[in-house]
Amino acid sequence: MKKAKMVVDRDFVIGEIDKRIYGSFIEHLGRAVYGGIYEPGHPEADELGFRKDVIDLVKKLNVPIVRYPGGNFVSGFNWEDSVGPREERPKRLDLAWFTTETNEVGLHEFAEWAENAGSEIMYAVNLGSRGPEQARDIVEYANHPSGSKFSDMRIANGKKDPFGIKLWCLGNEMDGPWQTGQKTAKEYGRVANEAAKMMKWVDPSIEVVACGSSSSEMPTFGSWELEMLDICYENVDYVSLHRYYENPTGDTPGFLARTMDMDDFIKSVAAICDAVKGKKHSKHVVNLSFDEWNVWYHSKEQDQEIWKQDKWNRALPLLEDIYNFEDALLVGSMLITLIRNADRVKVACLAQLVNVIAPIMTRNGGGAWAQTIFYPFFHASKYGRGTALNAITDSPVYSCKDYDKVPYIDAAAVTDDEGNVTVFAVNRDMEEDFELEIDLRSFKELSIAEHIVMHNDDVKAVNTEENPENVVPTAGKGGSITEGKAVINIPALSWNVIRFTAK
């Protein structure tokens, strides 16, 4: 059995974990809304048409914010289409996903769903086909009390009190050639700056997220952030990061090492933000919103076939990745990476939430179930709140195609006000268990409350409606703790949650 060591000291603090890093995302895309959260006539539908079984699963994840309504969708979206009497709302062609949007679910309906699910809305405005004026208008509609055109329109549409949306995205992936209204960094910086000013003039309490690069692989990554922030730095609060990983070649060790890239991406964007801060002699700190992250590749060929056969239909079954066990391991490592960067990453959204590259799947007229990636997110959201600690891990390493010195044990530690400690750990080793020694001597006397393990002998194992518990967490073997040092058995290829409680 291999060995690794970890030192967790209460005084080695990264920062407070913003609960919003456990956010998610619902886009008007595929069956995320229609046939996902919303299915009138389903046995589980409530009086609004929203599926209660889906809401129950979302509540279990305890998602504090949900980004909405896009995504690529938002760059061609007119917010006015989604309010007012449903029978008067127009049907529109969605150029982002080649489907027809009925606007049957709009802002008012989604706000009710979010409230029932225990979430707040992170609303994205259209800075693709539209501009600062329309962004200002939707803030007035959503947040201004009364006495103006758009606030009175909201009241006339049945919502007396403001929605009170506090976090807003200034467009989506505006550097991407696939985006409606693609812009250069300078073009976007000007539009984002003016939109942010006008939106905050309407409601000074809001925060806004500027579009960073669509991924770290974009040819303009780095220069985009520098040029854009040089224009809008003082008026924005966050820069967005988006990143998806894939494993089409079946290289599990290389796939599980991809969080090395994620960590580099975060640190690079944080450094750029700080460089602009220094250049401007500013006291304002711009932090990060990692508002799209996940594994995404399983459904791409299927999507191309769907578009060939059924373009412009409503609620096409797009981006319906079926996640396997190794995907859950990488999602666990991505959550660990977010925790370890809690000093700069203040918002993050698992993309997405239901049916579309999602932890929750449904069948029209049928059941709802948790995919493999549901469980690491559930554990992190439940136990990963409090203070992120700068845990020092000493682990054997391996090399793969893209990375050298990849630690077999990828881990993070969190403590709360009561002095309890939770360690999250992924064992990337395909063959061997690890004996993990965790030095906790700086804390008061602790006991091992629980060891949760997620493991499967088949890295391609999945959950289905017929077999929804094929890949699920189980009780681990635990371990011992003596004089402040714990020894825990970490199985090969596993996700682990080790909870210590103060005596």
Question: How would you label these PLM feature ranges?
Answer:
Residues 1-224, 229-238, 262-263, 267-307, ...:
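Non-catalytic accessory regions flanking glycosidase/transglycosidase catalytic cores in CAZymes
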Residues 242-258:
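Active-site His/acidic residue clusters
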